[in-house]
Curated annotation (Swiss-Prot):
Catalytic class of the enzyme: transferase
Protein name, as recorded: Ribosomal RNA large subunit methyltransferase H
Sorted UniProt keywords: Cytoplasm, Methyltransferase, rRNA processing, S-adenosyl-L-methionine, Transferase
Function in brief: Specifically methylates the pseudouridine at position 1915 (m3Psi1915) in 23S rRNA.
Primary localization: cytoplasm
E.C. number(s) listed in UniProt: 2.1.1.177
Subcellular location: Cytoplasm
Catalysed conversion reaction: pseudouridine(1915) in 23S rRNA + S-adenosyl-L-methionine = N(3)-methylpseudouridine(1915) in 23S rRNA + S-adenosyl-L-homocysteine + H(+)
InterPro entries, per database record: Alpha/beta_knot_MTases (IPR029028), RlmH-like (IPR003742), tRNA_m1G_MTases_N (IPR029026)
Amino acid sequence: MRCVVYSIAKSSPLELVKIYQKQCRQFDCELELVDLFPKNTANAQKVSKKLAQKSYSLAFEPYLNPKAKNIALHPKAQRGDSFAFSKMLENHLNINFFIAGAYGFEENFLKDCQAWSLSEMTFSHEVAKIVLCEQIYRALSIIFKHPYHK
C-alpha cells in the first residue's frame, strides 16, 4: 500500500510524522508527505480566494490518479470515527490525500475526490498532517487487527 499526503505548505515533515511513517511500514504501507508551494500560489493568495483556490488545484491536479483513492480533506465533508476511516481506506493499494491552503478547494477539484473531514475544528497544516498520519496508522491497525487500536 502507498499513502501520499499532498499539501499546500512550505514546511517539512515533523518528528512525530516520521514516527508514524516508520510505524506504517510494519503494515507494508509507505506513507509519504509531499509539500507543494509553487511561486504562483504565494501571489494568488494575496490577490483573491478564487485565484488561490485555482492555484491549489493546478498544483494538485498532476497528482490526481484515477487508479488511486483520491481524498480531499475538507471541513464541511463527511466525517466519521476511526473505524469508518479504516473502511474507507481498506482494499485500496494507492491512496492520495490532499490538504488545500488557507482558502480551501475549488468545487471542481472536489468532484474528482472523495471529501473527508478530520474534525469540525480548524487545524494548522502541521497539526492536520500529524492527525492524518496518526489516523492512517490507526486505520491500518484496525484493518490488520493490531493492538494499537483497542
